[in-house]
Amino acid sequence: MADIVIIGGCGHVGLPLGLAFAKAGRKVVALDIDAEKVASTNAGKMPFIDAGADELLLEVRKSKKFECTLDASVISTADVVITVIGTPLDEHLNPRLEVYQDLLSKDRSRLRSGQLLIMRSTVYPGTTEHVAHALKSAGFDVDVAFCPERVAQGVALEEIHSLPQIVSGTSERAIARATELFKLLTPDIILLPTVGAELTKLYNNTWRYIQFAVANQFYMIANDYGLDFYDIHHAMTEKYPRARGFPKAGFAAGPCLFKDAMQLACFDNNAFFLGHSAMLVNEGLPNYLVRRAAQKYDLRNLTVGILGMTFKADCDDPRDSLAFKLRKSLKFECKEVLAADPYLDKPWIVSPEELVERSGLIFVGTPHSAYKKLNLKGKPVIDCWKSLPGGMTVV
């Protein structure tokens, strides 16, 4: 018997949330299909990095407030079911709504009447109402709410408590139940209609994606004229409050930003030109760097190294990292391509020291802090992030 079941509960979104509710005194069961993650988490070992989570996992396992399972029958035992199933994109950049098919099927669903179903991950606008209608049509009297997460990977556990929680629902009862639940974690609750809440999450991520695209476009313009973008960036932002939030250049990737910008474009009947332009700029940066390097170096006869492969600094998640696009482009152009990353366990990963020793040219794929003390031995380093001493920001 559980107070809360989290579907997808051993991932980057579900697990920190489950730990937070367990810390608040609720009995939480994390349901997942990944047997390795379930076993690791039940053994008290986090399957990924998140600040403060290692200690909290041990604490809530000891208090028996938290456990993980592969058994989907646990869904029917809970008062609250939270799903962190999002709507991914297909190969044509359309949202895939069929991911909810099993949850909504009258024959396969483990839901029961009287439960509160909270959708937590990013979904295509209108999905919450669609889910509520499908459940009602299947004979389930379930309260349906959409309460999006907006946390950053690596600090999710901290931000669950520090960020306001957006709450929406398909009925007044759903809104009241969801509000009461999330007040266990934060006093700051913002109420919205369901489509407004769904758009808020898409707007948040798309706004960041566009900001990164502006920085990357500015970087490429400056670079094409032989200018250091970071000299200009400093001039723009130093003691100038209206440019305080202007980001630096770098790969804008990961499992959320690109996907959410394209979902918003789809929702806007593919008339969201800012989103499409941002996608072209951000996705094009790796190839731009390779093309510029090819104008300066004989790549065909060079061994080239990439420092960092995960999607952002000091993170162990490689999903949708543009460092992999960089690697693919370099493998087409270069004699040999090496890669190093302290957070990635792959047979082709080498140590950063070996990479520096063997490479004639080095790219920064992810600016992990561990590389700041790395002896680069005078090797040329292409560093669009300006993360390493001696790295080239002008290619």
Q: What do these predicted regions represent?
A:
Residues 1-395:
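Structural/interface elements that position substrates and couple domains in central-metabolism enzymes
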